[in-house]
Curated annotation (Swiss-Prot):
The keyword DNA damage does not apply. It is an enzyme of class 1 (oxidoreductase). This is Myoglobin. One of its GO terms (cellular component) is sarcoplasm. Heme b binds at residue 94. Gene3D superfamilies: 6.10.140.2100, 6.10.140.2110. It is found in: Cytoplasm, Sarcoplasm. The modification Phosphothreonine is found at residue 68. It catalyses: Fe(III)-heme b-[protein] + nitric oxide + H2O = Fe(II)-heme b-[protein] + nitrite + 2 H(+); H2O2 + AH2 = A + 2 H2O.
Length: 154
């Protein structure tokens, strides 16, 4: 799967808006993930105790983790598909230490699309959404291949 230059332009254009408030976007994305798929919360010892959206919004740890997640994803997106070096340690930790199923990466991808659309409706139309979906699908496909190399069937 390959994105065109025009698709990468759309992806990186919206990502520039994310970078204006990485922690805030990350927090919103994690809250969206946890609300939509509460089972994902069980993978996070630091956040298991957070039961309400208000508790999640008040959590500095959640905000910090959202920043970490989106900083890593931004680094991957900026490589425009040439993300082998960035992907390897991420796949290693998510497969062997955290045991995060690929399905959960689909869930967070959906949360990313949802939050970007709700925060930036004028800048995240159908073309940009399709491009971001394609970029996130490429990421998931490549991380799934790494999982397989590591013997994790997540």
């Amino acid at each position: 799967m390959v994105l065109t230059d025009a698709e990468w332009h759309l992806v990186l254009n919206i990502w520039a808006k994310v970078e204006a408030d990485v922690a805030g976007h990350g927090q919103d994305i994690l809250i969206s993930l946890f609300k939509g798929h509460p089972e994902t919360l069980e993978k996070f010892d630091k956040f298991k105790h957070l039961k309400t959206e208000a508790e999640m919004k008040a959590s500095e740890d959640l905000k910090k983790h959202g920043n970490t997640v989106l900083t890593a994803l931004g680094g991957i997106l900026k490589k425009k598909g040439h993300h082998e070096a960035e992907l390897k340690p991420l796949a290693q930790s998510h497969a062997t230490k955290h045991k995060i199923p690929i399905k959960y990466l689909e869930f967070i991808s959906d949360a990313i699309i949802h939050v970007l659309h709700s925060r930036h409706p004028a800048d995240f139309g159908a073309d940009a959404q399709a491009a971001m979906n394609k970029a996130l699908e490429l990421f998931r496909k490549d991380i799934a291949a790494k999982y397989k190399e590591l013997g994790f069937q997540g």
